[in-house]
Amino acid sequence: MAAIRKKLVIVGDGACGKTCLLIVFSKDQFPEVYVPTVFENYVADIEVDGKQVELALWDTAGQEDYDRLRPLSYPDTDVILMCFSIDSPDSLENIPEKWTPEVKHFCPNIPIILVGNKKTAGDEHTRRELAKMKQEPVKPDDAKEMGSRIKAFGYLECSAKTKEGVREVFELASRAALQAKKTKSKSPCLLL
């Protein structure tokens, strides 16, 4: 049985865990050193609901310097992973401020999975550091509410470091991409 090919693009603030999530899923190893992404591609196979799916994983740079380069990733996208870091409330604020408008402009009608990365970041040390800035880790209810607000296909939390929830993120993304094909034929991602 031939694999069904789907393109997944991951977006979100710089250093929110996008690359780690992709590397842990595709290579089953956690990168210990942070290297800012410019543009990377990975391929991974996954079976969902009895179907073999070959996911082309397109990593993107979250930093503002790449705002003009990032749209080159969007054509022919089947599903978007829109990420924030649970230990960075600011990265959640950027979901409706920056990422949703950008994605909905270039990829109208493409399903979005909202992903809370760094699930294990709710530890005591992180809480203390955030408290110094009068902040706290993102609460699951706040993230779910954000998912509803941006009309995401779903919301999941994961930890690339412990691998908790990683496979579920890509299973849900694959399901979203497979369902979307029925309605997508007239509305592919656009590059304007």
From Swiss-Prot:
Compartments it resides in: Cell membrane
Propeptide, chain numbering: 190-192
Entry-linked Gene3D superfamilies: P-loop containing nucleotide triphosphate hydrolases (3.40.50.300)
Protein topology in the membrane: Lipid-anchor
Binding site for GTP: 12-19, 59-63, 117-120
SMART domains: RAB (SM00175), RAS (SM00173), RHO (SM00174)
GO cellular component labels: plasma membrane
Sites bearing Cysteine methyl ester, chain numbering: 189
Source species, domain of life: Eukaryota
Pfam name, any one: Ras
Lipid-acceptor residues (S-geranylgeranyl cysteine): 189
UniProt key word Transcription regulation: no
PANTHER family: RHO FAMILY GTPASE (PTHR24072)
Recorded family membership: Belongs to the small GTPase superfamily. Rho family.
Name this polypeptide is given: Ras-like GTP-binding protein O-RHO
